[in-house]
Every structure is written in structure tokens, then in C-alpha cells.
Amino acid sequence: MRANAGRAPVFKPGELNVYSAPRDVGEVSRALRHTGRRVMLVPTMGALHEGHLALVRAAKRTPGAVVVVSIFVNPLQFGAGEDLDAYPRTLDQDLAKLRAEGVEIAFTPTAASMYPNGLRTTVQPGPMAAELEGGSRPTHFAGVLTVVLKLLQIVAPDRAFFGEKDYQQLVLIRQMVADLNVNVQVIGVPIVREHDGLAMSSRNRYLDPAQREAAIALSAALTAGAHAATAGVQAALDAARGVLEAVPGIVVDYVELRDGELGPVSPSGSGRLLVAVRFGTTRLLDNVAIEIESIAGTDGQPVGPDGRVQSPWRN
């Protein structure tokens, strides 16, 4: 059901209730919490795919959960020349998918209702926002964090769910929640992939058949980098970049290896390998957690913790 403007919002359990006014979804969320329900937020920009539905399913696994899925193409996070107007808007199909998943609340605001006073107040995301994605999209994360903070304030969820595909976004949201004392638990959900390994993304639909075939190089590069990490940080980076640069039509924006908080990576231990590439105007991201298990010995061969020479490739 859709809420009617000018009336108190109505919530029907077991149905998909659609609210466009921030005040309405906020009132319903507060009322449900008072009855003992636990409010779960899944922020999206629509064009829902299996990656989004994995977030929904993770949220629904919480005992007593009522899931709120927001669908809002946020203009603040699109820079000059980016694809705001072209971004897919498939609201009817999205709502049908949410009904099939048993979601009870969809929040579908307009830009006017989210930013009634324009851009008077925004979030400054800090220095990490200038790195990685921020290198080519300098205003992106200010827009992301502003809308996420507004959604958290409007819905006031117990937990909010974000995919690990946009890993830098996830880290910055966690920083914001900690630094601004926002009372919510941020849950990261693993990447969902197509049958051939390509990370699911709403932007995949922009790829032509040749680009779509070439795009599997992203996951192949991450796999190569993860295996090569037994020979150290530089070996992992070289292996990943080598896979990407061998594929015609790919423009590599970055290949980076960081720690789990996106700080400098240690010579051994856990890390996060991140890649970003472009096919024409379509930009794709991917990442994977890796273990850097050894360092190079004096002869250039990887040496494990026991001091023995190891092969840089393992199954």
C-alpha cells in the first residue's frame, strides 16, 4: 500500500507499505520500535539486483526485524558529467522484487523532500574521501555520507546494511557513525557475483556484449592478486594490474592494496585489494580480502613464516 499525503501514515503488517514523505516513514519506524520490532535499513538507489536482495535477506535474518528499503537516486553523489540523468529508474520493478522478498516498508522520497533547503548542510567526509574513488570523484563521498546520515536520522534503524562492493563507502560510513556518535550498527554484506565472477552492479547494464565479456577481468585480476600475495604486496599489485592491462578496452583507474580500514597495508597479514576500471563512460569497481602470507627473501623468492621458500601460487 502507498501512504496518502495529508493523513497519518498507516502500516499494514505483512504487506509492502510505500512511503514517500520522510515524516511518514519516521513515524512508522518509531511506532514499530515501540512495539518491539527491530528496524533494519537497506539504503539503495533502486535498479535492484541480486546484490541488493542479498542485503535485504541479511536484514530479514535479524529476529523481530522490520526491513526498510530506501529507493532514492541521490543527486548529491553524482559529479559533473556523471550519469545522474541516465541512472536507471525502475521503481515498479523494484517494488515487485521487494514484495517477493517479504519487505514491509519501502521509502521512496524525492530530492525536494530530502533536501527541502537545498545543500545548506552537508557532511565533510575527511581525508580518506580524497583517495581511491575520491581521486576521480572529489565530491562523491560528501554526497553519499550526507544522504546516508539523513536516512539514518529519518528511519533511526537498529542496523543498516551495505554491500562490500563499494568498500570505501562502507569504511567511510563506519567512520562517520563512530565519529558522530550515530546510534546504529553498520553491517557489511559480502559481494554477490554473476556466474562468471563479475560483481553485481546496476551499472553492468551499460556494458555492451564485448565490454561485458571483458569485464570478467576484474574478478580475474583480484584472484591473481590474491594468489600472488604469497610473494608480498608488490607481487599482488603487479599480478592484478597485469591481468587488467592485458585486456583491450579497459582503462585502469587504480589498483591498490590497503589494510581493512584502507590505511597503509602491512608487509604481511590481512589486506584489501581494490580495483577500479572504465569501459568508455562506464566505471566498475571490485575488491577482495587477501592474506599477505610471506615476504621476499634475499634471493627474491617468497619466504613463509617458517623460513622456507614458498611458491607464489597456491590453490
Curated annotation (Swiss-Prot):
Function, as annotated: Catalyzes the condensation of pantoate with beta-alanine in an ATP-dependent reaction via a pantoyl-adenylate intermediate.
Gene3D superfamilies reported in the protein's UniProt record: HUPs (3.40.50.620), Pantoate-beta-alanine ligase, C-terminal domain (3.30.1300.10)
Lipoprotein in keyword set: no
Miscellaneous: The reaction proceeds by a bi uni uni bi ping pong mechanism.
Entry annotation: catalytic residues: H52 (proton donor)
Domain of life: Bacteria
Enzyme Commission number(s) of this protein: 6.3.2.1
GO molecular function: ATP binding; pantoate-beta-alanine ligase activity
Entry binding sites for (R)-pantoate: Q77, Q169
InterPro entries (UniProt xref): Pantoate_ligase (IPR003721), Pantoate_ligase_C (IPR042176), Rossmann-like_a/b/a_fold (IPR014729)
Organism: Mycobacterium ulcerans (strain Agy99)
Protein name: Pantothenate synthetase
Root EC class: ligase
Gene Ontology biological-process annotations: pantothenate biosynthetic process
Main location: cytoplasm
Classification via Pfam families: Pantoate_ligase
Subcellular location: Cytoplasm
Binding site for ATP: 45-52, 163-166, 192, 200-203
